[in-house]
């Protein structure tokens, strides 16, 4: 009979495997890895974890300058032949891979080379803000690595996302275990080959098997931090495993990203950006547009332009040959179900079609829906398929109210005049807001990226992403001789503390000055009590000594 605690652990493990295989909308169901028995897999992962811990101790002792030198060498090797590394990514469009994965990865690497020394240096805290009663206290903030960081990678950007996260982790002095998405080990193996040639010591970065069991096993053996890019369902399952050991994590999860079209927006620009966002990487991008909030006038004009441009793009693609289909049909099937529900509730499907030839509904093409409402499931789901819903609103305030009905708050886009868009962007609850463009500006390596709500927590990339890879240690040095808290209590202590509070926190300098005489009197009384106590104790000790003398 299985004990209740053991049974619960087994069920959690099953849940994680299920989420990593099926509920994570950015992983393929098939896997190229060799199936390893769970016991053997656990032993193999344990060996990798121990090797990572040993490597981390030595790696963290290397000066930061030396670590960054290796990163620079790696960057230059990739730049010398970027097509070779791009060819290892399972994507037909090499130009898109170079633009969406290789170039941002190199930019992030150079950002670390130039900024990591500033970000990771020990900082002496200034005296400003120090309480008066703690004069003489000095504080140094020292960044230290976590230890071993587990990175669970996605399949939509299998090189860029885990690659940047791994580089940030090792820059901070951690070692890294990467669990690749299914069929994505090859590109990361290529990256690690280059890293080894650049001088990265063995076991500082290691690849785990693609099996979800590998991630589960290493989490149960308590890594020091987990960075996950995946669906909200995967994040929920992983969080349960991490809860027992209170392992910290960063989770970049699902999006249902919104586009806000203000009245003074350029409809031509909006339609161009929507077409780009819907078709980039087959719409398998967490920041892809899914909801458009616009007035009737703007919606009509944008829909007219967007449909014409989409039709032109489809004719162009047809003339150039068949477009490769992604192997994972699950996102298309889920999208088809959500679209059908929306149509039955009054939405209109303007482009794309649903095919039922295989017995199950499946979306084909880009689906543009009009007359969608925020309570429809299609506007509240983390779809990983080219689906765009137009939600018509009468005001900016209504747009924000409708937007808030969705639990996903990863990123958003605003179109309008610069000043008005800047003001409106500050009212949006999202981790990142882009103005008058879409997705591409977020490749800037300075920009931190992270979601809120069901879209995750913590940050990746930029300075904030690097700081996620360290834990701060505060080193506090006290004054050498004045430590009144070590004295024995006296009846005057409360008076002294009261006047100290009045002195430091009075409503004006005048009232602070009024507290000074009272503070002096209370302090003198305190000193008098202590002096009298010392004399009394001394007299008693002398008397006892005389009584003991024969």
Per-range role (PLM):
Residues 2-138, 513-543, 548-550:
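N-terminal Rossmann-like NAD(P)+-binding subdomain of aldehyde/semialdehyde dehydrogenases
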Residues 6, 10-16, 20, 34-40, ...:
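ALDH superfamily catalytic-core signature
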Residues 32-39, 356, 363-550:
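Conserved C-terminal structural/oligomerization subdomain of aldehyde/semialdehyde dehydrogenase
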Residues 37, 54-61, 150-151, 260-261, ...:
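Short, well-ordered beta-strand elements within core beta-sheets of diverse protein domains
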Residues 56, 60, 75-78, 82, ...:
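Structural signal for hydrophobic packing residues in well-ordered secondary-structure cores
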Residues 63, 67, 109, 173, ...:
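Residue-level signal for inorganic ion chemistry
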Residues 128-269, 393:
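Rossmann-like NAD(P) dinucleotide-binding subdomain of oxidoreductase/dehydrogenase enzymes
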Residues 209, 230, 351-353, 416:
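Short loop/edge segments at beta-strand edges and connector loops
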């Amino acid at each position: 009979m299985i004990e209740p605690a053991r049974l619960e652990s087994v069920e959690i493990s099953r849940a994680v495997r299920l989420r990593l295989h099926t509920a994570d909308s950015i992983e393929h169901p098939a896997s190229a890895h060799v199936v390893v028995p769970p016991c053997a897999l656990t032993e193999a992962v344990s060996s990798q974890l121990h090797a990572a811990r040993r490597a981390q101790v030595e790696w963290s002792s290397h000066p930061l300058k030396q670590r960054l030198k290796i990163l620079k060498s790696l960057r230059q090797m990739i730049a010398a032949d970027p097509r070779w590394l791009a060819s290892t990514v399972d994507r037909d469009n090499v130009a898109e891979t170079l633009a969406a994965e290789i170039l941002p990865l190199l930019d992030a690497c150079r950002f670390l080379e130039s900024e990591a020394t500033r970000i990771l240096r020990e900082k002496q805290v200034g005296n400003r803000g120090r309480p008066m009663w703690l004069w003489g206290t000095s504080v140094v903030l020292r960044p230290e690595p976590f230890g071993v960081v587990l990175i669970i990678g996605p399949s939509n950007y299998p090189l860029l996302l885990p690659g940047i996260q791994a580089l940030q982790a090792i820059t901070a002095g951690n070692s890294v275990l990467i669990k690749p998405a299914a069929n994505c080990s090859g590109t990361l193996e290529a990256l690690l080959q280059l890293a080894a040639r650049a001088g990265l010591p063995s076991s500082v970065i290691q690849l785990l098997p693609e099996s979800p069991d590998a991630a589960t096993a290493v989490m149960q053996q308590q890594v020091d931090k987990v960075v996950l890019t995946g669906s909200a369902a995967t994040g929920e399952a992983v969080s349960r495993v991490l809860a027992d050991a209170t392992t910290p994590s960063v989770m970049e999860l699902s999006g249902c990203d919104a586009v806000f079209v203000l009245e003074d927006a350029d409809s031509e620009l909006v339609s161009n950006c929507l077409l780009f966002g819907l078709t980039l990487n087959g719409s398998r991008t967490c920041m892809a547009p899914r909801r458009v909030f616009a007035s009737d006038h703007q919606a009509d004009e944008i829909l007219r332009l967007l449909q014409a441009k989409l039709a032109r793009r489809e004719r162009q693609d047809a003339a150039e040959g068949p477009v490769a289909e992604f192997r994972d049909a699950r996102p298309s099937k889920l999208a088809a179900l959500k679209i059908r529900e929306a149509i039955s509730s009054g939405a209109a499907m303007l482009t794309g079609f649903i095919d039922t030839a295989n017995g199950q509904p499946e979306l084909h093409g880009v689906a543009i829906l009009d007359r969608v409402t925020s309570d429809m499931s299609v506007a509240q789901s983390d779809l990983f398929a080219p689906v765009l819903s137009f939600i018509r609103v009468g005001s900016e305030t209504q747009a924000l109210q409708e937007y808030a009905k969705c639990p996903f708050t990863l990123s958003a886009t605003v179109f309008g005049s610069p000043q008005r868009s800047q003001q409106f962007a500050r009212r949006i609850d999202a981790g990142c807001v882009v103005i008058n463009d879409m997705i591409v500006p977020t490749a800037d390596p300075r920009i931190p990226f992270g979601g809120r709500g069901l879209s995750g927590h913590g940050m990746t990339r930029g300075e904030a992403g690097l700081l996620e890879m360290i834990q701060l240690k505060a080193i506090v040095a006290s004054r050498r001789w004045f430590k009144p808290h070590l004295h024995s209590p006296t009846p005057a202590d409360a008076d002294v503390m009261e006047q100290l509070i009045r002195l430091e926190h009075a409503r004006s300098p005048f009232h602070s000055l009024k507290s000074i005489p009272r503070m002096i009197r209370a302090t003198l009384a305190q000193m008098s009590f202590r002096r009298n106590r010392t004399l009394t104790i001394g007299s008693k000790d002398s008397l006892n000594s005389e009584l003991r003398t024969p």
